Amino acid sequence: MPSEFSGKHVTVAGLGVSGVPAAKVLHGLGAQVTVVNDGDDERARTQAAELEPLGVTVRLGDGDTLPEGTELIVTAPGWKPTKPLFTAAGQAGVPVWGDVELAWRLRGLNGRKPAPWLAVTGTNGKTTTVQMLASILKAAGLRTAAVGNIGVSLLDAVTGEQEYDVLAVELSSYQLHWAPSLRAHSAAVLNLAPDHLDWHGSMEAYAADKGRIYEGNHVACVYNVADKATEDLVRAADVEEGCRAIGFTLGTPGPSQLGVVEGLLVDRAFVEDRQKNAQELAEVSDVNPPAPHNIANALAAAGLARAFGVSAAAVRDGLRAFTPDAHRIAHVADVDGVAYVDDSKATNTHATEASLAAYESIVWIAGGLAKGATFDELVAGAAKRLRGAVLIGADRALIREALARHAPEVPVVDLDRTDTGAMLQAVQEARRLARPGDTVLLAPACASMDMFTNYNQRGDAFAQAVRELGA
């Protein structure tokens, strides 16, 4: 049992996905654990009832007051740094960790050899890239898992019985903010666009938290050649001596880059004499789906895998074996020569821009909660691809106004309803606008909570409506 936790008074901030496991792990390590939580609803009381028999103290309805005697706070990643709890902790000299920081510090628990982390962040594409990376690592015969915001929890991965050779780790800006000691084997920032600014306070603070993923990297910092902000983060990072900057691009790669040449994914980074040579990794058609932004995800995953010494054949086999999650550019059906594609996961303009760029002639279903987003740049860039648009949700007027300014010739159907049944009508209206060869694309550019529980339910409603068309 690590002596640093035995008898220590630790406050866990927030019940839920990360709080309950953190409380259990810390209690098991001998800490005196108090959990504080803002809410006092039925779910919170159920979780409290799970912890209290272990000897964990749970305080519901007050997440702002620092418990007396606290020596360490372990926080859920979504808790804002400006909360009074953290202000009080700062004044008292109490350190604050996130669940990722805790997992990082527990990697060598019980004398086990710590598994290296290959870490991924970015505004969009994190989950897909980490899943691709895990598929490639498995194809190489390595014991691995996709962890972090997906799959196995990080705490379970580092404290459970299963041992790993390497972990593919998805990290959000929230998690990185609270993980000062993280030092990955290699890491990638896929892209940067304004997101979660209400939490971070500014784009500069958001980018700085994303950039923490590069700090102390050992082998490679993988960046997006098309997104200079990601390269700037590499330049600003304090890395281990010998760590390399590795770019990925949808164009022809230069030395120390991965890219695309004549329908092939190629590596000019992890080869001998990279000034002259390149290694074929896979065909573009091996990427599912082969949309431009997904090819970029595949190149980033390949870069991290190659940094870990994985063969070109394993990259190819892993990409071929990969199947994307539901609601991420998922082809639902073809009806009367029209393709219906579900990208409900496109909850912001950056993700939607990538989705719209994947198709030539689109009937676009969009709308929901805008979260302060503006749509002029998105619409202006996609205008020539739009056959029509069907708008749903609370903030649809913002998209309608952008369409009027930048694509006035595009027919728009504005559905003045926010009930879940609106999706069926939206799909029916999209069918009316579409022509054979078109794609009806659900890429909302907005959050879903005005009409649905989450983006999964929204995507399910779309898929069900499409199935009814073909019935």
Swiss-Prot record:
<keyword id="KW-0067">ATP-binding</keyword>
<dbReference type="InterPro" id="IPR013221">
    <property type="entry name" value="Mur_ligase_cen"/>
</dbReference>
<keyword id="KW-0131">Cell cycle</keyword>
<dbReference type="InterPro" id="IPR036615">
    <property type="entry name" value="Mur_ligase_C_dom_sf"/>
</dbReference>
<comment type="similarity">
    <text>Belongs to the MurCDEF family.</text>
</comment>
<dbReference type="Pfam" id="PF08245">
    <property type="entry name" value="Mur_ligase_M"/>
</dbReference>
<dbReference type="Pfam" id="PF02875">
    <property type="entry name" value="Mur_ligase_C"/>
</dbReference>
<keyword id="KW-0436">Ligase</keyword>
<feature type="binding site">
    <location>
        <begin position="122"/>
        <end position="128"/>
    </location>
    <ligand>
        <name>ATP</name>
    </ligand>
</feature>
<dbReference type="GO" id="GO:0008360">
    <property type="term" value="P:regulation of cell shape"/>
</dbReference>
<dbReference type="GO" id="GO:0004326">
    <property type="term" value="F:tetrahydrofolylpolyglutamate synthase activity"/>
</dbReference>
<keyword id="KW-0573">Peptidoglycan synthesis</keyword>
<dbReference type="GO" id="GO:0005524">
    <property type="term" value="F:ATP binding"/>
</dbReference>
<keyword id="KW-0547">Nucleotide-binding</keyword>
<keyword id="KW-0963">Cytoplasm</keyword>
<protein>
    <recommendedName>
        <fullName>UDP-N-acetylmuramoylalanine--D-glutamate ligase</fullName>
        <ecNumber>6.3.2.9</ecNumber>
    </recommendedName>
</protein>
<comment type="pathway">
    <text>Cell wall biogenesis; peptidoglycan biosynthesis.</text>
</comment>
<dbReference type="GO" id="GO:0008764">
    <property type="term" value="F:UDP-N-acetylmuramoylalanine-D-glutamate ligase activity"/>
</dbReference>
<dbReference type="InterPro" id="IPR036565">
    <property type="entry name" value="Mur-like_cat_sf"/>
</dbReference>
<dbReference type="InterPro" id="IPR005762">
    <property type="entry name" value="MurD"/>
</dbReference>
<dbReference type="InterPro" id="IPR018109">
    <property type="entry name" value="Folylpolyglutamate_synth_CS"/>
</dbReference>
<keyword id="KW-0961">Cell wall biogenesis/degradation</keyword>
<dbReference type="GO" id="GO:0005737">
    <property type="term" value="C:cytoplasm"/>
</dbReference>
<comment type="function">
    <text>Cell wall formation. Catalyzes the addition of glutamate to the nucleotide precursor UDP-N-acetylmuramoyl-L-alanine (UMA).</text>
</comment>
<dbReference type="GO" id="GO:0051301">
    <property type="term" value="P:cell division"/>
</dbReference>
<dbReference type="GO" id="GO:0009252">
    <property type="term" value="P:peptidoglycan biosynthetic process"/>
</dbReference>
<keyword id="KW-0132">Cell division</keyword>
<dbReference type="GO" id="GO:0071555">
    <property type="term" value="P:cell wall organization"/>
</dbReference>
<keyword id="KW-0133">Cell shape</keyword>
<dbReference type="InterPro" id="IPR004101">
    <property type="entry name" value="Mur_ligase_C"/>
</dbReference>
